């Protein structure tokens, strides 16, 4: 059963806390990873109005475009390339205040100015996907985003 997204105004942490609860409720009885990624990307995107919110799935030695919200996207990213590939390789969240300063950044859109990429791992610790969020503003993402997005991605195991 679909739930209506209910995120009222408030600060960033308050929005994330409410978003976390709603995603937890929505995903608790759904076992399909793509369905959960699709709903999570829509909920995150519409709560914060980010430029682009996408999941890339690990397929072999590439990240392959998965559920997303926003403009057209790069379809495939190699292991270790760009912000997404680096998050996968290093198995840790990447917070990039200015994408132009990130060595090897892959410019899917010139509108993207800052980015956060959060790896998603399975029960064995293997990276299965990454959540990539872009903003058209510099310095959009901070430790609050990192902490809450890591918690949200943890719901999708």
Residues covered by each model-derived region:
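Intrinsically disordered, low-complexity terminal regulatory regions
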Residues: 1-68, 72, 151, 156
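Juxtadomain coupling helices with adjacent low-complexity linkers
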Residues: 24, 134-157
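Short loop/turn motifs at secondary-structure junctions and domain boundaries
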Residues: 47, 107-112
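Short hydrophobic/aromatic beta-strand element in the GNAT-like acyltransferase core
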Residues: 52, 117, 130
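Regulatory sensory and allosteric helical modules in signal-transduction proteins
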Residues: 58-108
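A short, aliphatic-rich beta-strand micro-motif
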Residues: 114-122
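Sensory-domain boundary capping and coupling elements
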Residues: 121-135
């Amino acid at each position: 059963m679909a739930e209506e997204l209910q995120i009222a105004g408030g600060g960033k942490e308050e929005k994330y806390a409410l978003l976390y609860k709603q995603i937890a409720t929505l995903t608790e009885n759904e076992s399909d990873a793509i369905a959960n990624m699709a709903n999570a990307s829509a909920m995150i995107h519409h709560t914060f109005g980010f430029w682009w919110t996408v999941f890339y799935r690990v397929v072999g030695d590439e990240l392959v475009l998965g559920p997303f919200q926003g403009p057209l996207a790069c379809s495939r990213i190699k292991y270790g390339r760009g912000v997404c590939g680096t998050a996968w390789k290093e198995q840790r969240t990447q917070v990039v205040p200015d994408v132009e300063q990130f060595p090897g950044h892959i410019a899917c859109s010139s509108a993207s100015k800052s980015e956060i990429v959060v790896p998603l791992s399975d029960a064995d610790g293997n990276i299965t996907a990454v959540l990539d969020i872009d903003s058209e503003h510099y310095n959009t993402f901070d430790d609050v985003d990192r902490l809450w997005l890591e918690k949200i991605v943890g719901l999708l195991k």
